[in-house]
Design a protein with these regions (language model features):
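Sequence/structural segment immediately N-terminal to covalent heme-attachment motifs in c-type
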Residues: 24-43, 106, 110-133, 148-150, ...
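Cleavable N-terminal signal peptides
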Residues: 12-13, 23-24
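C-terminal capping alpha-helices of c-type cytochrome domains
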Residues: 84-106, 150, 173-183
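Gly/Gly-Pro-rich "capping" loops immediately C-terminal to redox-active cysteine motifs
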Residues: 44-75, 80-86, 119, 131-160
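Extracytoplasmic/secreted proteins, especially bacterial periplasmic and envelope-associated proteins
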Residues: 31, 35, 61-64, 78-81, ...
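Bacterial N-terminal signal peptides that target proteins for export
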Residues: 2-11
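Interdomain hinge/lid region at the active-site interface
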Residues: 166
Length: 183
């Protein structure tokens, strides 16, 4: 019984390709997330104050945010254009990846007076939805604790100006906030 070289070659090739497909499938989430690293840092741990940390955000929050960017309903400098370049499947892959990353706190200078005022504002206006000091990773309302202060201020200014969609219960709370409380 002779060995068919074509059949053997096909078998070896298919085994190799199956292995390569597995490697690519395992890396695809990380590779997709790396496309965000320029602004949002490696594994979603932002290195700069203009971009939020993505590490630990819930899948639904990430998906909803990217959908809003794609549809042009969330203000952005470039994210509206970037989001349009991803398929829904790619966005879901990135959402799963970032949700699985540990929450990373931005390195911000500590100002005791500002921290105290921020805690009071949080307790009064934010705690019902942004659980555990705003740091609950699975919270679909988004992570507040550990985000860059300039990014939080930009976001709150967008909410306050009506430039960004938000739940009605949040709109009621944001409307009551003074500019000083937002800072």
């Amino acid at each position: 019984m002779g060995c068919n070289k074509k059949a053997l070659g096909a078998l070896i090739g298919s085994v190799f390709m199956a292995g390569a497909t597995q490697v690519l499938a395992g890396s695809s989430a990380s590779m997709m997330a790396n496309t965000c690293a320029g602004c949002h840092g490696t594994n979603g741990q932002s290195a700069g104050p203009a971009s939020p940390n993505l590490a630990g955000v819930s899948e639904s929050y990430f998906n909803d945010s990217m959908k809003a960017f794609k549809e042009g309903t969330r203000p952005a400098t470039i994210m509206d254009r970037i989001a349009k370049g991803y398929s829904d499947e790619q966005i879901e892959t990135m959402a799963t990846f970032f949700a699985g990353q540990p929450v990373h706190k931005a390195m911000v200078p500590h100002d005791a007076a500002k921290a105290k005022a921020g805690a009071e504002t949080y307790d009064k206006s934010c705690a019902k939805c942004h659980d555990e000091g705003g740091s609950l990773p699975g919270d679909d309302a988004g992570i507040l604790a550990g985000q860059w202060l300039p990014w939080l201020e930009y976001s709150m200014a967008d909410f306050k100006a009506g430039n960004r969609e938000m739940p009605k219960k949040m709109a009621k709370q944001v409307e009551k906030l003074s500019d000083a409380e937002i800072e």
